[in-house]
Amino acid sequence: MLSHRKSLNILKKTNALLEGHFVLSSGLHSPKYIQCAKLLSQPHKADLICKSLAKKIKKNFKKIDLILAPAIGGIVIGYEIGKLLKKETIFCERLNGKFVLRRGFFIKRNTSVLIMEDVITTGKSSMECVKLIKKSRAKLAGFASIIDRSNKKNLKIKKKIISYIKIDVPTFKSNQLPANLKKIPYAFRYL
């Protein structure tokens, strides 16, 4: 496992972790922006992180039969973790605003399912995946992600999240910006 510092360095070098002043899709402002697609677009660098995350998942979950990844962010990491753990991996996608299984994907009854995401912030997508698992009468093995940037206040997930790295990403309403963030012009272009 890479050190926290080296992990952050990889995320910064791949532009998966940016620092500055950003307006997030929620409308909140933040000095950090995370885009795991940038990490995953460089497989030779993402490989180290994926292998370490797969080891953590294997250590923390006794039984996983299937990996379910919400589209679009979870697809690549779901595939990589599935490959490393030798587990079938499927994804769900939105149709009329709700996650559904398409493309011939299904979840067998009593299957133990791991939900795999790139980043977990509020857990909303993960909890929508839980509905699909329950509807299929399968079992939730747990939750995993490359980055856990959740905070207790906004998190919908009540179970432990296994992540490669936990990053504190403070957010602020536009009328409550700290002085140092007010001085930096903000960017929308990463959304």
Walk through the language-model features, giving the residues of each.
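PRPP-associated nucleotide enzymes
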Residues: M1-L191
